[in-house]
Amino acid sequence: MVILLVACVVGSCSITRELEQNASPIAFTEVNNYFVKNNSVPQKLLRKVINTESEFRAIFGEAAVMGSNGQPTPINFKRQIVLAVVSPVTDIDTQMYPLSVLQNGNAIIFNYKVDKGSKMSYSICPFTAVVLDRPATNSSYEIYWNER
């Protein structure tokens, strides 16, 4: 089954507000315990639909830590896809996290938040990513990326 997902960056919030009115929530899992590889750091904000493990591994590396929640989020690319937003390197304390994923027909809306703090003495490459079940149909989907 081949699924075509078309990425669309929303220039106007009114489009997403309109789509969100009749949208249904989609279950998602936040991607944890990964990092952006040094050779994959974008020069500008990257919004990407990731369909395969090789695409994912080209951008992200595992960052397991000790403890009960220390393992990287498992992803089964036969059944799931990843929506990722990756920022360029910054020395500003930046946290990115998902708020919701909604669906209205063939439109999928990924709402995420970016919190910025103060200048730091080191650089980071902030990102947020979610794992979704792969859509059941062969329809094309338009992805709307919405920073709140």
Where are these regions (language model features)?
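Sec-dependent bacterial lipoprotein signal peptides
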Residues: 1-11
